[in-house]
C-alpha cells in the first residue's frame, strides 16, 4: 500500500492520481501542526471574548444573523452535519470517496479553518483504515461548497449514516468499531469547516482529467494507426507547418505524431510515389484539433491542481491577526468552467476518432475493402461498429452542454448564484466512457486496415500497438460476435495499453 506524507497545499497531480487509483496510508507532516493549533486558538478566543463570528456562534446561510448561545455551540455543529446530509443518487465508489477525503484533509490542514488536529487526524484514520463514508453522487450545486456530499462524509466521523469497510456497507458506528476507531464530537466552527469546500467538485473533475489524459494519448496512437491504414501522408505533421502558427498544443501534438510515424517503415516507403495531394481533415488536421484539446487538458490541470491545494472553507481564520473573515472561496466556478472546457475536449477527441472510423469504412476514401472485410455482402464487417461509434459521439455532443452558465438561487436567495460544478465534473465520466468506446472501435478498425495492406508494416511503436491488440483480438476474416472485441479493446485502453507508447505531454 502506498504511504504518503501530506504537506498541506503541496499535492502533485501524480500524487492525486495515485490516491484515486490506490488505497493510501497518510501521515500529516509535522510542519502543519502549529498553524492548525493557532487557528483553533483564534476560534476559542472569539468564543471566550463573546465576539460574534459567522459559523462559530451564528446560524448559517439566511440564518447568519441568529446568535447562538455558548452552551449550544457543539449541538449547532452536529445539527449542521445532520441537516445538510441530504444527498441523493447512487453512492460514490471507494476511489472517489478516498480522493474527496484526502482533498478535505489537505485543505483543513492548511490552518485557516479553525478545526482541531484531532478531527483532522480522525479523517486521516478513516482513509488509513479504508472506512469509506456513503456519499450520494447528487445534491450539490457547487456553492456554498459541496455541502451535501461533505455532510455525508462527515456523518461517519460522528458515527452516523453508513460507511463501507472491506467492501461491506455497515452502519457507520459499526464500521468505526470494526476498524478500531471512535466517533468524534465537533467543537465550534468544525462542522462548517468540514462541510464548506469544493472538494467533491474538484475530485469529480480530477477523475475526468485523469481519464481525458488516457483518452488523449490513446486517440493520438489510434489516429496514427488510421493514418497508416489509409496510407495517409506524413507531411501534415512537418514541424515547420506548426511552428508557423505558433500554437503550442498543436506544435506538441505534431511532435507526438512524428514520434509515432517514423520514416523508416514499409508503409512510409510506399509513399515515395504517392499520387495523393491532400488527405481529408480528419487525418490532416489532427495536430490542430488534438492540439486545441491538449491546451484544454493543460488548462484544466493548472486550475484543478490549484483548487486541490486550496483553502475553500468559509469563513477563514487568520490567526496571526486574530480575525475571522467571511468570503466566497467555496464558490466552485473555476472548477465548473474548466470541467466544461474539458467536456468539449473529450467530445472532440471522440468526434474526430469517429470521423476517422467512417473514413476507413468508405472504400473510395480509404482504398480498402468496404467495411474492412473481404467478401462483403455475405460479411458486414465493421458496418455497425461504426454506427455504435456515431451513437456515442452524438451522445457526447449533448453531454458537452456547459453547466457553468446555469444557476439556480438557493437558501432563500442568500446563495443567489451557484456554479453547478459537481454536475459539470460528474458528466465527464460518462463522456469518457463513450469516447473510450469510440477509440476502441478505431483501434480495432485501424489494425484491421493495416492487416489488409498485406506485406506493409508500420513503425515499431505502431506495430507494438497492433500487436497488443492482436494478442487478444484476432483479425476478421469473416463476421463474428462483435461486442466482445469492443469490450476487450475498451478494457485494454482503460488499463493504459496505448498511453504508455506516448511520451509525457502534460
From Swiss-Prot:
Entry's EC annotation: 4.3.1.3
Residues bearing PTM 2,3-didehydroalanine (Ser): 144
GO molecular function: histidine ammonia-lyase activity
Protein keywords: Cytoplasm, Histidine metabolism, Lyase
Cross-referenced CDD domains: PAL-HAL
PTM annotation, UniProt: Contains an active site 4-methylidene-imidazol-5-one (MIO), which is formed autocatalytically by cyclization and dehydration of residues Ala-Ser-Gly.
Pfam families: Lyase_aromatic
Per UniProt, location of the 5-imidazolinone (Ala-Gly) cross-link in this chain: 143-145
Broad EC category: lyase
Any one of the GO CC terms: cytoplasm
Reaction catalysed by this enzyme: L-histidine = trans-urocanate + NH4(+)
GO biological process, one term: L-histidine catabolic process to glutamate and formate
Gene3D superfamilies recorded: Fumarase/aspartase (Central domain), Fumarase/aspartase (N-terminal domain)
InterPro entries with a match to the protein in the record: Aromatic_Lyase (IPR001106), Fumarase/histidase_N (IPR024083), HutH (IPR005921), L-Aspartase-like (IPR008948), Phe/His_NH3-lyase_AS (IPR022313)
Keyword hit for Protein biosynthesis: no
Pathway: Amino-acid degradation; L-histidine degradation into L-glutamate; N-formimidoyl-L-glutamate from L-histidine: step 1/3
Cellular compartments annotated: Cytoplasm
Family: Belongs to the PAL/histidase family.
Protein name stated in the entry: Histidine ammonia-lyase
